[in-house]
Amino acid sequence: MRRLFRFLILPVVLLLAACSGEKESAAGGVVSLSPALTELVCHLGREDCLVARSTACDWPESVKSLPTAGDFAEPELERILAMKPALVVSNEFVNPKDADALRQAGIAVELHPCDGFDDYREWVARMGRLLDCPDEAESELKRADARIAEFEAELKNAKEKPLRALYVIWDSPLLTAGADSLPDAVGRLAGLENIVKTEKGYPSISLEFVLKEDPDVIVWFAHGKDWKSNPSWHGIRAVQTNRVLIPLDDSALLRPGPRMFDGIADLKADLKKMFPPETAPETAP
């Protein structure tokens, strides 16, 4: 029974103490190894619970002052163990051995996929329970559902056909966002139809496939890469017509966090500028 208390009850007690400002050291609190979850903790008004972050966690700006405890989904065990947090949160990509080591040390570990709207809802509900902010979590769930319903209603009433899109995550090898990925989900709400329909996740594809599918637009997420200097891209119609869209803040589209709904709205606005109503393909009468 004492062992059960140590592993299940004590971390929660420490966490609540940390969030209420009762701790005098780094003991207690939350380590987030996921940028989306770091953003969610802050959005729910519990930034004071955070004691460390991953190197990929960079928003809001204030979290950059926190110490790092590893890379995205890759904990630095010794550093985390020295911090003695109450809770570590991340997606499911954390090595099970690392997660077990943290649990054996009495640290609660919450791992769950973080890839789409349903996962986001699940994390909001979990954080509401874990961080003792049920009202804030309920409010965020209502906001998320309302934004999704708003986008879906706009799609239903749209006169234009969905634009066929390619999402470039990396250019060499050519990695794209497949079916059921987060870019696929947010793109659909922005009025895009993914040309990659059968492969899930983030598959590697060929330029020959892209030429054959002939997308209307390319959404370019490959930082520091330039298609203009690569002759292989010059035969693609979207490149020839300068319909390659580089999101101003792609992290809002690539992270399943509270900012993704604003990211969808921004993507819709960018597409509207690129494809004015008089040039967009219309739906059949």
What does each model-identified segment do?
Residues M1-I9:
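Bacterial N-terminal signal peptides that target proteins for export
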Residues L16-A18:
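C-terminal motif of bacterial Sec signal peptides marking the signal peptidase cleavage site
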Residues A56-W59, P67, L141, L175-Y202:
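Alpha-helical, coiled-coil/dimerization segments enriched in small aliphatic residues
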Residues S34, E92, I169, E199-Y202, ...:
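Short secondary-structure boundary segments
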Residues V94-Q104, K212, V217-I236:
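A ligand-binding cleft/hinge motif common to bilobed small-molecule-binding domains
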Residues G21-G29, K97-L175, E193-T198, N242-P285:
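Extracytoplasmic substrate-binding proteins
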Residues G29-D98, I195-T198:
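A short, structured surface patch at a secondary-structure boundary
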Residues L77-K84, Q104-A105, I205-D214:
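Short helices/loops that flank or line small-molecule/ion binding pockets
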